[in-house]
């Protein structure tokens, strides 16, 4: 789904697919830009197997049920008559069609005397995220999905195989426009130092974060830092979908090696549930020092992070720390572009306030750096490279970067809705 759109406009054009024309659907991971349209596609292609990793088989229903609830709310809030795009019954029916694959173990699909072999590999982007190798009639196609090669605190980096020479490589390009200026561990240390300074001056540190993967990763980071006394002890508040997913992360961590996470972290950090239902930035007073770890990561309206942020901007003791990508059109993206003492408006509350709190950005992305992707392509030696999952400027960086390799392999920068032979 297109995260910048609402309603039917957010969906891919599934009408280009003939009825009953798909043999299988491979879900790479559970973020809604990949997962959100699956119930609709699955209904249109009832014969298709739905292939997922084991963690994804547990997480996807929770993500879709939350998406259903959000759409029900937005139906009236934003006057979107077609919402919800799917029902809870659709989610249950889809879950029954999930076929969970183990990482690194090939799975064969046969049809009309032909056989395709499919293998999932851990992609490191988020728990359950998969890259996909398709082997068919002597050819190999590798789809990275959203991928991260470096280790996180809760998750190992991608375990992609060495396949050179490869026939087709489908590459994500999310960070094509982003040049890394600091190593991940250095960014984590900088975040912890900012938290510590905020707490020591009696302030509140808000960390807006994506519910799936990012909140759980930050809980592990906070726990590890607290063990080493890198920031003063203080109340830590969490809420929303990120906390609802904790039990599933814990269960997966107990039964597999897919994730380094235990819900015992919540007790050791003395995590408190944020129970405030009504927030009025003009009258609500929050007590510091404290840390708030809340979704959404882009500070979208009507989310816990947005509501808490509205109460923090007026005090220079406070900090708001963004740890992932914020689309420029979202409140988070707009706040990052706002200068100190410049007025920022919280549209949900019709409330404007000069920015006096510290606003900082930390590069803790779940996507691989462009240079890492560049080196990955060179190592795999594909005959054809297909660029996906990135804005046009991001994909153009890769197009230009590989110009010198044009004699070695073809680079395809596809247009939406156009069919290509690879």
Describe each PLM feature range.
Residues 192-331, 388:
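Hard-cation-handling environments
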Residues 184-188, 269-280, 298-301, 340-344, ...:
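A general structural motif
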Residues 1-26, 31, 35, 40-217, ...:
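His/Asp/Glu-rich metal-coordinating catalytic cores
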Residues 135-137, 158-162, 186, 221-228, ...:
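Short, solvent-exposed amphipathic alpha-helical segments in soluble enzyme
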Residues 23, 167, 290, 318, ...:
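Conserved acidic residues
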Residues 1-2, 23, 142-144, 148-150, ...:
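Acidic/glycine-enriched edge-of-secondary-structure segments
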Residues 240-247, 251, 320-335, 340-363, ...:
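Short, flexible loop segments at boundaries between secondary-structure elements
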Residues 360-380, 384-422:
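Internal alpha/beta domain cores that form substrate/cofactor-binding pockets in large enzymes
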